[in-house]
Amino acid sequence: MARPIQITIMGDADQLSETLDQASEEVSAFGEQAKGLALAAGGAIAVGIGAGIAEALEREAGNDVLAAQLGATPAEAKRLGEAAGEVYSAGYGESVADANEALKGLWQQGLVPAGATADDNGEHFEKAMDVATVLGDEVGPTSNAVGQMLKTGMAKNADEAFDILVRGAQEGANKSEDLLDTFNEYGVQFKGIGLDGKTAMGLLSQGLQGGARDADLVADSLKEFGLIVRAGGDEVNAAYKSMGLNGAEMTKAIAQGGPVAKDALDKTLDGLRKIKDPAERIATAVTLFGTQAEDMQDALLKLDPSSAVETLGKVDGAAKSAGETMHDNAATKIKAFTRGLQTGLVDFIGGTVLPILEKFKPALEGIGSTMATVGGFVSEHSTTFKVVAGIITAVLLPALIQWGVQSTINAGKAVVAWVTSSATAVIESTKQALAHAKVVAGWIASGVQAGLNAAKVVAGWVLMGAQSMIQGARMAAAWLLAMGPIPLIIAAIVGLVVLIVANWDKIWAYTKKVFQWLWDWVKKIFNWLEDLFLNFTGPGLLIKHWDKSRSATKNTFNNVKNFAKDALNAVVNFVKGLPGRILSAASSLLSAGKRIGGYVIDGIKNGLSKLGGFASSLASAVGRAAKGAINGVIDLLNWATPNKLGWGKLSIDLPDNPIPKIRAMGGPASGWTRVGERGPEDVFLPNGSTVRPNHALSGSGGVTVNVQTNADPFAIGREVAWALRTSPA
């Protein structure tokens, strides 16, 4: 009947395996990050160059359209284009087209001084855009209003007009967002009653602060006053007479305009404020200011030309100050910086690259007929070229990459298979050696995985380079489409395909040589690892000398078996002769039986005790010898192992002793020794230390392995007992 035998096996290499797995994952993660960064950088560069070319072409076309719209000379058009570029680079507008639109408005309204440089023009453009931003309007309406202010005498120059508009908006004159329209519509009327821009803006601000609906209502009231008083008449004269003024003189002053008319307006408003009776005052106001006075009501009495300018406060420099305030922030400065870089690229392409390409235009046109012929050939054989291009794109390149990667994977599989077969032999020889074979196998497998991850990174770089080349080709094709004739593009593409087809054998041959060189290099590395494993590790030495070890072990067990057999035969012969001796001494049978039983029992006890001691000593001696030999090899490997594998960021840091020694199984120990039952722990033990194994402690844990045998334990016991009894020990 088969009986179970319990065996406790000690071994733990999880920590080393996890450490190496983490290192492999870090290498792989770095490869993915490097690939992502390289792809992002390559894409950004390609997009930037493509956008620069497109913008250079667009800017040149926009400048030509602007010059045609303004009728500017080539020199003037150049200065205007440079000014527009500077304005955009400084962070103004959403595009160069916006700058061109602002420039057109200023030019058409006469706001660009004759002979102004690009810098001067740029300064005017920037102010126009700043004022438009303050007013919440577009540059076009702002330029129109400023131009009208200059034509009607509201301002001496564009800078003064900009200051007046900005200061008026800051004082609330643009309450209903009609300030630009008001100056554009009523500028002539303001001039007719002797008002300049500052005074007119001050009156608008006073009326709005007094309760007027909007700037248009205040301006319309002033317009009606000028028309009514200039026409004169009995009602006008009577109204002035009620205020103690001469109507005829007032009519003459308003008709004269200028400062005299302004003074007449001032006296009229002062006279209205002196009338105590509200009914009489409103009736007089309606007579002189028309029905708008009914809408203005008391707001009309707030108008005072003599203090209007003071109401605005400081006007000069208002536009410049507002612009500096708007652009004194990080966002605007960053925008200006990036646009400056972009404009530099565009200027280089438009001013250097495109003119050089223009010089090649005649030569390219000379080969137009040849390109047309080639284009016809391609058209006739389009199917063939499509097949070749499809094979190159869809089959060949992926196949080459897959072949290279698969070769590396196959190499890794071969090594893993070899290590697995070696580990199997180690398992059958000794369980302790199996644990360390797994450690070594895990180490090598991690190294193979790191190599595969590195190969993936390289493949990513290759793919990134291919994608960058493809994007570059697309950009170049778009560039040529925008500048050159279509046959030239067709010829370039056809030429590329023809070159690939014509030199395909060379390309394939060189590619195979490169991959063959890589494969030979990989095989050399793994051959070196195989030699190292067989000659410098405990499991490797067991594998290499397995036949000798097995033969010696077999001879030893045969000797033990023969010895046990002879002993059992002696026991049998003794038992056969025992009855005769018992019958001849019947009188002392009982005492003799007792003595014989006692002798047998004591002999078995002593024999079993000696057998146990012998087995324990034998196991201990073998274990110490094996552990010492393997630990010696492990010390050599730990000494020879570097602290870091790889170069730079593609490196893996290794611990000082990556391969732990055999776990302490009891007995003398010294140096770094791995102990611990629930988890591996490395401790440094001084000479003369003794380790007591867990299985020797009460309640110690372990792994129970059930081993079945068909041998008869009672027969084995009888033979062992007889052998021990008759042995000389």
Curated annotation (Swiss-Prot):
Coiled-coil region(s): 9-35
GO biological process entries: viral tail assembly
InterPro entries (alphabetical): Phage_tape_meas
Keywords for this protein: Coiled coil, Viral release from host cell, Viral tail assembly
Statement: the UniProt record of this protein carries the keyword Glycoprotein: no
Protein family: Belongs to the P2likevirus tape measure protein family.
Functional summary from the UniProt entry: Serves as a base for tail tube protein polymerization and acts as a template for tail length determination.
Protein name per Swiss-Prot or TrEMBL: Probable tape measure protein
Species for this entry: Streptomyces phage phiC31 (Bacteriophage phi-C31)
Gene: 43
